[in-house]
Amino acid sequence: MTRPAAFGISFDSDRDQTSAAAAPYNSRDHLAVQDQRSRLPVHKHRKELLYLVEGHATTLVVGETGSGKTTQIPQYLHEAGWTGGGRMVACTQPRRVAAMTVAARVAEEVGTELGQQVGYSIRFEEVCTQGVTCIKYCTDGVLLREMMEDPLLSAYSVVMVDEAHERSLATDVLLGLLKKVQRQRPDLRVVISSATLQADKLAAFFDTTTVKGQGAGATGISKSPAIMSVEGRTHPVQQHYAESPVLDYVQAAVTTAVSIHEQDLPGDILIFLTGQEECEAAVTMLDEEARRFRRAQGNSLRLMPVALYAGLPAASQLQVFEMTPRGYRKVVAATNIAETSVTLEGVVYVVDSCFAKQQAYNPLTGLESLLVAPISKASAAQRAGRAGRVRPGFCFRLCTEQDFQALPDSSVPEMQRCELASTVLQLKAMGIDNIMKFEWLAPPPAETMVRALELLHALGALGDDARCQSCLWIPALLKLFLPLLGSWPVARRWSLLWPCSACTACGQEPMGSAKPTMKPNSGLLLEKAT
């Protein structure tokens, strides 16, 4: 078992003898909301940002963690008049909890009720008022579904794609579609922001100045993307590594958190694990430690373990962001949902397992898997940055420094490691018939694309010419079914049977060929083809 001595460090220099039980000091807590806004690093770049957005079709913002880009840029655009004429500013997030929490914060800063001038839209829930909402936070998947009804996004004047470095499937598809939309709508502005953005690659993707007839038009709008860097507000974070490889990273993470708690220093703890089962197991172990500490009564701070993962109900997710009661130390066991966008105030210590679950797809067998894999250095940097928001922090990585240096610099985009049948069908329904010529930020493997077309043809969704069958039905049916596909506990190919069978007037049970079986204690359904 890994004990604190495995890191070979001491917290004595960080100890505050006068207020051990106090919450971590945030120098901006006492300020009014508008004063807090003015002290964010992005505020000094406000005029520069608005100038770039005015003169360039695409603007790339490289903003470090804590710069305020997610909350402030949409407000700057609103204040500059980009929401005039009934249009909105959209800001996409890769996860629903980020869209909800950021929208709530921005509504507070604007001084309006959530759902009025500022709203959000996620799967199965929309808190907006038509004709009133000016700033809309949504997941990238929601905006993709809106494009099926309004391909040119006529309701928006600016679309901001946040956390683009995560390179999710929906984000990559959205970026490709936005590039197409800009050809038809020169007035549409696209702002792409991230903390670890590969700006040069994205700039080259959106640069159309080399395309014949795509230079600066009569309006004077430059087709060459502008790049702006914004410094962060993070405090220094000490990074520590295990002296030897860790056998059980869940147990090691709990042990490390307990050792931090025993030092009786202020500050919450954030543990990064890979999934729901691990988070719940860690919370159970921490609950046992909390009872032990209460019996011993040797610590002035009480442990308050909580979990944070995508499967939690929205209300439970939001509870994690509530202020930690005085006299308690919150320990959050989270998946990579806490890696970007969301801010857990009060976190001083990060315990990083250096693992995450990633989707993998083998086009030869047609099987998808959810694997536990090492994270990239870029993700590790994001996780460490969670510890430096309110004061100097500590990051404990449960791997040796040698193993950390062997990690890849960045993760493989989801586009290149997942099945694409539903994505291809969605693009076909939007009228993009020649998928092979669609401009991808990261082109998917040819074998994966061929497999997707074969599957859709076998299901009857595509004809021999690779065009949509019953083209009048598919867009409407996809709009109805796509919000449900991700929630059905079956493999993606079987969920596609429902809209496809409806389009082809199939009279048999569409799910008859898939007999789901329950895996004990997992809550997941595994496909079993007959």
Regions inferred by a protein language model and the residue ranges of each:
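P-loop NTPase motor module signature
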Residues: 1-480, 486-488, 500-511, 515-528
